[in-house]
Structure formats: structure tokens, C-alpha cells
């Protein structure tokens, strides 16, 4: 705080002047200095590398040391094959020793892009004098790299930079000393360790870990070490580690309670193309409609998670002033007002006429159990025409509904009739629930402008209630499978292309052409995608598999939680079917973000031998990370395993008893891998000391080296701020 209680003003971020210092190459007149001027309409105003063979780079030298916070890339006025699809930025006080500040890519458009560079270590700003830009991939395969214009911004006020420079020098010195301390302790150079620590007064780690090293490595007090780990777990010190672990999916088939003898009438039957929504407050799943293989359905169900029971709200909603039987419609729920909306449907070409092609729009009130027709024809009210395979999202806070895409049904011939006129797709609409008015936000567009969006069917669309954006990806347009991914800010009416789908990241993103069901967790900033079966018969039975993906919104990265790469066989193993749902399409997936559970029902298994077959299985899916209890048990297992191995060398009989009792209880005997590892431990009873492998610590005894290795393993579970440095001194030696 400044004098008088006023908050000190944030240091001013301004443009940082720089000069071109070094470069890998350049071609013809495309000189490195060209990046100093911004001329988006001049095609020659750029640096272009002579080749795309690595390493290609530009090194910029700032006029004086500065905290470099942002880098801005200017571009040519049109898309260009030489634009950087992937690049990295490094920075440092000298050109020989640089830290990675950014790894990213440019969109292939004409808009300037600004990126935030890493400029803090442990919340402390650090300065740079040199910035190195390393192109990795251009938008056109095998084209040279081009950079049109670069702007650096940050803080170069000496009054701010100098203290940061002093801190950075001190930080590097401190880390070097900590690496030495770690090395000395690993090799049991006690005098050197104590002398250096006494002289520098630098701590290698948190006192708790020093205590653990003393108890475990020096004294071999394994019981005290276990107590220390238990305290750490209970104090939440392993939480950071848990949050960084990958999810593991846990499917469970739900067998609902049966109230009637025959068990048929008290749960929804087989179907595909149905719709589900979930009320997370009451833990109730609502299911409406679908196609059972021969006809559309109009039944309406509620499943109570707490009661594990389905209730039939209505056998035929049309008889209760609700929607007629339908499939390929969409539903969304307003949890605040406890209302469900439904729009759209598929109609066979044989029953299409001007009356049946009207797009009706209904609202169901949960508390009063009543349906209300909001519109006989949304197109006449300024909304979408009759569509199917569209997407619909609810914004409860602003009481708005967004609907995007879907195929518009027309009278002229079948949807699959190639002689029919080109298929029409619906744009992006907003419905104001309060005023009951529609607004067209984006028409279907084939243009590639920054604010244009291409309509499609079978895509995923999700609303992030916290950052107030719609996320759209995947889908199909005529015969083309789309792989783009964009967000739409509902408040600013702005489209942001996350991925244009041209990246050849096969295996790193969910594959196109497969039915995808997606959910969102606004609290965790995650999008979940279950990828199932393709609707295309040709693509269907090559390699049927389910895969589950998670997109981290903040990190802008996909990760595959699992794939079951079983080949498609008519006789899928029974055991597999009991463990997880078989691949399918036309199913429904909903997510309870409060209790972190997914629910899946029904669908079409795509069996060519029985095309009318539909499913009525019901599953829950939990994404699990290691729990605190699991980590505590695992750490105890590691400690006791080591203790057993030490005992086995000294007193095999005592070791055997320890193995059968103390070590036995730390093993999960339902886990085949853990059980196998446990069974193999008995072989240690028959090993001689010479059988044990050296750990590279030739100057310390085997016991000390083994305990040090166990200590290093246990340290990995603690937060980085508490642990010794990750690197090793010997790794700095270059050959």
C-alpha cells in the first residue's frame, strides 16, 4: 500500500523497442528487419526463412532489460501458407541461456494476435534482454516460415526492472546451490552438505521433508515416516498431485428398482434418437421420445438417482397438450425455473406436407406437470424452420435459449435423395424466454471470415455458464465431416476459432465421423466427449470403439481418457458388455456437474444383421482420480515394501512374517497388477546382497542409496514449493 492508504498503481505496460540480433536464414528480399514495420497490405514486408529445416529462428535484442509480458504478431491482409501454425518463444538475459516463455500457434487469418508470455517465477517477475522466436510449422505443408510483424510489450522502467534483475540473479544462484545440496545429500557427503548449508543459509526443501529424510534415510524409522505421510495426506498436501493426475473412467450399469412383476412397464423401452436432460438439484434425469425401430415414441420419463427408480410421467404427451411422438428433437432444462423446452423432430418424407413441416415449440413445467405450446411454427415467429439433429442450450441466468445447426426439412423428396435440391442447414438463433421472441444471430455461411460459422448436423454444442460462451465442434455437412472447434461469446456476439480443423493431430483430438456426445463442467473448465459409432454403414464396422476425451478449456488441450480398441464383432464378449456400454449412435448422455456423474441411455448399436435393433441399457460414468486414501495406502505400500526388502537381507524369517501381515494389508488384492507385484516380492527372500542392482551411487552403501530412491519417490507426491529441485547436478554436464 502506498502512503495514505492508496493502492500503488500497476507499472505501465508499453511497447519495447528492439533490434534484430541474429537469425537462422532468410530468403531473397524477405529480410529479418521487415518484422519491425507493420504493412499488412504489402506481401514483401516480412521475414521468410530460406528453408523449413530446423532450427529456424529470429533473436531480438531489447534496448535494455525488460519484463516482457506480451508478444503481438501482425499478419498479411489475406490468409497465407507461410503463416506460423506452431511456434515457440524463448527469453533470457543472454542468448546462450533462455527459458521457454510460450508454445502456441497463429490462426491463418488477417487479424493481429497477442499472446501473454511467461514472465514470472514463483509470482516474481523476471527480466529478459533477448527474445528468440522459433517457428516449428507453417500452415502450408513444407512451406518456408514467414513472420510479418512483431511487437513486444512490457515494463522497462529501470526502477522496476533492476530489483527484478537482482532477484533473478539471486534466484539462479540459489537454485544452483540447492542442486549442489541435493547432490551432496544423495551421495552422503555430510560434511560438504552441512558446510554449504551453514554458509549459505539456503534451505534445500521444506522442514517437513528434511524431517522425513532424517527419519527414513538416515535412521530407517519407517513407522515415523508412515505417520509423517499420513499427516501430509490429512493436511491436503497431496491435493496438487491428485489434481494433475489423469482421469480413469468407471462405468456402472444401472439396474433400476422394479415395482411391477413383469418389470416391463416401469422403465423406458428400447430406443434411439431420444432426448434426456438432468436436474442436478434434485438428481433427476428426464427422458422423452425417440424411435424404437418401427415408430416414433411420445412417452416421458423421470429417473430419480436417489430412489434408483424410473417414473412414467406420461405414456403419450400429445394427449396432455404436449408434443407429439418424435425423434431427433432436442431438449434443454432451465434448472432455476424448473422448466424443460423441446424443439425440432425428424419426419419421414412420406408424411411431409405444409402442415406437418411446421416447427412446434413446447415448454414443460416440472412443478405443475403441464405442457405449454409456445409456438405452432417457430419459423413464422422469426425462429428456425423445422429441423432435426440440431443443438440447443439453456442460459438460465439470462433466461435465453440458443439453438444452432440441424437439417431443415423440406417437402421435395427424401433427405437422402441426391436429386433433391442442396440440403439446407439452420443458423444460430437465440430465444428470449421472457419476451418469447426469436433472434437470428448467424446465418449458415460457407465463407471463412472470422465471424462466420458453418452450420451442420450431429455436432456438439455446450454453454459455459461462467465465461458465457457456447462451444461448438464436430458434426457433418452433407458428405463432409467437420473437425473445427469454435466458441461464441453470447454477450459480445463474437466468434473465436479454437481450431479450424486443418491440423493433422490425428490421435490427439477426437476423430471425426463418429457419433460424439459432449458435456461441460464450468467449475472444472472441462468439456467431456464420448465418441461412439459412426452413422455411416461403410465406416461402421472396421474398428468399433468407444473413446472418452477431455478438453481443458484453460490449457486449450485435449487428452484421451480411454479407448477400448476392440475390433467390431457381432459376438462382443459378455464380460466387456458388463463392464462398459457397447459402441453405439443415436444414444443420449447427460452430466450432473454437481455430483460429477454422467448418465447414458439407449441408442442404436448399428448391427447390420438387425437394423431395427435399439438398446435400453442405462449406465453411469464417473471419472476418477487417485483418492487421498489410495495415495496413503500406496505410500504405505512403498515404505513397507522397502522395509521388507531390508529385512529379507538380514532376517528372512522375520521378513516373511512381515510380508504376510504388515505388507499384505497395504495391497489391493482385487487389483490383478498389485496382486502380481505382491506375489513376486517373495523372491527377495532368496536373493543375496550381490544380486541387487547398483543405483549409480557408487560412493554410498546400498541401503542408503535404496532409501534415497524411496525418499525421492515419496517427495513426488508433495507440492513443488516444498520439494528439492527436480533436476540433478550431473545432468548439467554436457559431453
Curated annotation (Swiss-Prot):
Per UniProt, the keywords (alphabetical) are: Acetylation, Cell projection, Cytoplasm, Kelch repeat, Repeat, Synapse
**What is the annotated localization of this protein?**
Cytoplasm; Cell projection, Ruffle; Cytoplasm, Cell cortex; Synapse
Outcome, altering residue 53 to A: Reduced head to tail dimerization
Q: Answer yes or no on keyword Cell inner membrane.
A: no
Chain coiled-coil ranges: none
Q: Which residues carry this modification: N-acetylalanine?
A: 2
**InterPro entries named in the record:** Beta-prop_ATRN-MKLN-like (IPR056737), CTLH_C (IPR006595), CTLH_complex_component (IPR052456), Gal_Oxase/kelch_b-propeller (IPR011043), Galactose-bd-like_sf (IPR008979), Kelch-typ_b-propeller (IPR015915), LisH (IPR006594), Muskelin_N (IPR010565)
Query: What is the annotated quaternary arrangement, including any partners?
Result: Homodimer; may form higher oligomers. Identified in the CTLH complex that contains GID4, RANBP9 and/or RANBP10, MKLN1, MAEA, RMND5A (or alternatively its paralog RMND5B), GID8, ARMC8, WDR26 and YPEL5. Within this complex, MAEA, RMND5A (or alternatively its paralog RMND5B), GID8, WDR26, and RANBP9 and/or RANBP10 form the catalytic core, while GID4, MKLN1, ARMC8 and YPEL5 have ancillary roles. Interacts with RANBP9. Part of a complex consisting of RANBP9, MKLN1 and GID8. Interacts with GABRA1. Interacts with the C-terminal tail of PTGER3.
Its function, per the record, reads: Component of the CTLH E3 ubiquitin-protein ligase complex that selectively accepts ubiquitin from UBE2H and mediates ubiquitination and subsequent proteasomal degradation of the transcription factor HBP1. Required for internalization of the GABA receptor GABRA1 from the cell membrane via endosomes and subsequent GABRA1 degradation. Acts as a mediator of cell spreading and cytoskeletal responses to the extracellular matrix component THBS1.
Query: What is written about domains in the entry's comments?
Result: The LisH mediates head to tail dimerization.
What's the protein name?
Muskelin
Provide the species name: Rattus norvegicus (Rat)
Protein's gene: Mkln1
Amino acid at each position: 500500500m502506498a502512503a495514505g492508504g492508496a493502492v500503488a498503481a500497476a507499472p505501465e505496460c508499453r511497447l519495447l523497442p528492439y533490434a534484430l540480433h541474429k537469425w537462422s536464414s532468410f530468403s531473397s528480399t524477405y529480410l529479418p528487419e521487415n518484422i519491425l514495420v507493420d504493412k499488412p497490405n504489402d506481401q514483401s514486408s516480412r521475414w521468410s526463412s530460406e528453408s523449413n529445416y530446423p532450427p529456424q529462428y529470429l533473436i531480438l535484442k531489447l534496448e535494455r532489460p525488460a519484463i516482457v509480458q506480451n508478444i503481438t504478431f501482425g499478419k498479411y491482409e489475406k490468409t497465407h501458407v507461410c503463416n506460423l501454425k506452431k511456434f515457440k518463444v524463448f527469453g533470457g538475459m543472454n542468448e546462450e541461456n533462455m527459458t521457454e516463455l510460450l508454445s502456441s500457434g497463429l490462426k491463418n487469418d488477417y487479424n493481429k494476435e497477442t499472446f501473454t508470455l511467461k514472465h514470472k517465477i514463483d509470482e516474481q517477475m523476471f527480466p529478459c534482454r533477448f527474445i528468440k522466436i522459433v517457428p516449428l510449422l507453417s500452415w502450408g505443408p513444407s512451406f518456408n516460415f514467414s513472420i510479418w510483424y512483431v511487437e513486444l510489450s512490457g515494463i522497462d522502467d529501470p526502477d522496476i526492472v533492476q530489483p527484478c534483475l537482482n532477484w533473478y540473479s539471486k534466484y539462479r544462484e540459489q537454485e544452483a546451490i540447492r542442486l549442489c545440496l541435493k547432490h551432496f545429500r544423495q551421495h552422503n557427503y555430510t560434511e560438504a552438505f552441512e558446510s554449504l548449508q551453514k554458509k549459505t543459509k539456503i534451505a534445500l526443501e521444506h522442514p517437513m521433508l528434511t524431517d522425513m529424510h532424517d527419519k527414513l534415510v538416515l535412521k530407517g524409522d519407517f513407522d515415523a515416516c508412515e505417520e509423517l505421510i499420513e499427516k501430509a495426506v490429512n493436511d491436503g498436501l497431496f491435493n496438487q498431485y491428485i489434481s494433475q493426475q489423469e482421469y480413469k473412467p468407471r462405468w456402472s450399469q444401472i439396474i433400476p428398482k422394479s415395482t411391477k412383476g413383469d418389470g416391463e412397464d416401469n422403465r423406458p423401452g428400447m430406443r434411439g434418437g431420444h432426448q434426456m436432460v438432468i436436474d442436478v438439484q434434485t438428481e433427476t434425469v428426464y427422458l422423452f421420445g425417440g424411435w424404437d425401430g418401427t415408430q416414433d415414441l411420445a412417452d416421458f420419463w423421470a429417473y430419480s438417482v436417489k430412489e434408483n427408480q424410473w417414473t412414467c410421467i406420461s405414456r403419450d404427451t400429445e394427449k396432455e397438450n404436449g408434443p407429439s411422438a418424435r425423434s431427433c428433437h432436442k431438449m434443454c432444462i432451465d434448472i432455476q425455473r424448473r422448466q424443460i423446452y423441446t424443439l425440432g423432430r425428424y419426419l419421414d418424407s412420406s408424411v411431409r406436407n405444409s402442415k406437418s413441416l411446421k416447427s412446434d415449440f413446447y415448454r414443460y413445467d416440472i412443478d405443475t406437470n403441464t405442457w405449454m405450446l409456445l409456438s405452432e411454427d417457430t419459423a413464422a415467429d422469426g425462429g428456425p424452420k423445422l429441423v432435426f439433429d440440431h443443438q440447443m442450450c439453456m442460459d438460465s441466468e439470462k433466461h435465453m435459449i440458443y439453438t444452432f445447426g440441424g437439417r431443415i426439412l423440406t417437402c421435395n423428396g427424401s433427405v437422402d435423395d441426391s436429386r433433391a435440391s442442396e440440403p439446407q442447414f439452420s443458423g444460430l438463433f437465440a430465444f428470449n424466454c421472457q419476451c418469447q421472441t426469436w433472434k437470428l444471430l448467424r446465418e449458415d455461411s460457407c465463407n471463412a471470415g472470422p465471424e462466420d460459422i458453418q452450420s451442420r448436423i450431429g455436432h456438439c454444442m455446450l454453454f459455459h455458464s461462467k465465461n458465457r460462451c457456447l462451444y461448438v465442434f464436430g458434426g457433418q455437412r452433407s458428405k463432409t465431416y467437420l473437425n473445427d472447434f469454435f466458441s461464441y461469446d453470447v454477450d459480445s456476439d463474437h466468434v473465436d476459432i479454437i481450431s479450424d480443423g486443418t491440423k493433422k493431430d490425428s490421435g490427439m483430438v477426437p476423430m471425426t465421423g463418429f457419433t460424439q456426445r459432449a458435456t461441460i463442467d464450468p467449475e472444472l473448465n472441462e468439456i467431456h466427449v464420448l465418441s461412439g459409432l459412426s452413422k455411416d454403414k461403410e465406416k461402421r464396422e472396421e474398428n468399433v470403439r468407444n473413446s472418452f476425451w477431455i478438453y481443458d478449456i484453460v490449457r486449450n488441450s485435449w487428452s484421451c481418457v480411454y479407448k477400448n480398441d476392440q475390433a467390431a464383432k457381432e459376438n462382443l464378449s459378455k464380460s466387456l458388455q458388463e463392464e462398459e456400454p457397447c459402441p453405439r449412435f443415436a444414444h443420449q448422455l447427460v452430466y450432473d456437474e454437481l455430483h460429477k456423474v454422467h448418465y447414458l441411455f439407449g441408442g442404436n448399436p448399428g448391427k447390420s444383421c438387425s437394423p431395427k435393433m435399439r438398446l435400453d441399457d442405462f449406465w453411469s460414468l464417473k471419472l476418477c482420480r487417485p483418492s487421498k486414501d489410495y495415495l496413503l495406502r500406496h505410500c504405505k505400500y512403498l515404505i513397507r515394501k522397502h522395509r521388507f526388502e531390508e529385512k529379507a537381507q538380514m532376517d528372512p524369517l522375520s521378513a516373511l512374517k512381515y510380508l504376510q501381515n504388515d505388507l499384505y494389508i497395504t495391497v489391493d488384492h482385487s487389483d490383478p497388477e498389485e496382486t502380481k507385484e505382491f506375489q513376486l516380492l517373495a523372491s527377495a527372500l532368496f536373493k543375496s546382497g550381490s544380486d541387487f542392482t547398483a543405483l549409480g551411487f557408487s560412493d554410498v552403501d546400498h541401503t542408503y542409496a535404496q532409501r534415497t530412491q524411496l525418499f525421492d519417490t515419496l517427495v513426488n507426491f508433495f507440492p513443488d514449493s516444498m520439494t528439492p529441485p527436480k533436476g540433478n547436478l550431473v545432468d548439467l554436464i554436457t559431453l
